[in-house]
C-alpha cells in the first residue's frame, strides 16, 4: 500500500505544479498584444496575490500548456486509481480473500447469489480511461493551433466525458 501512497504523493505534486504555473497575472495582455491603458502590472500582481505578471502577452493568450499539464496530471492520477482498484478487486476475490468489501457497496450476481461483485471498484477502473482520451483529444486539437485566441478549444472534450 505504501507504493500507492508514493504514487499519490507524486500526483499531488503534479496538481500543485499546475496551480503554481497558473499563478501569473494576465491583466493587461488584452486579446493579443497588450493594452494602451496605463496599467501597473506589478501593482495589480501584488493586489491580486499573483506570484508575478506574465512575461509575454501573445504567449499569455496563446498558451494552452496548462490544459495539457492538468489533463496529464489527471491521467497519471487515473492510472494510479485504476491500479489500486484492480488490486482491491484481486484481493477481494475468492482466490486471495485478503480484504472484505462491505455488503453496502457490492452487488449480488443474478446467477450466483453468494457472489459479491465489487461494482464501485470496477466502475472506477473502467472510468479512468476517459482521462487518457481527453488528454489525447486536447493534444490533437492543440497541435496546429496558431498564436493568439481561437475558438478551436470549444471542441475540447466535455468534463463529463
What are these regions (language model features)?
Residues 1-144:
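Internal glycine-rich alpha/beta core junctions
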Residues 147-153:
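Short, solvent-exposed helix-loop connector elements
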Residues 154-161:
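Conserved small/polar residues in nucleotide/adenosyl-binding loops
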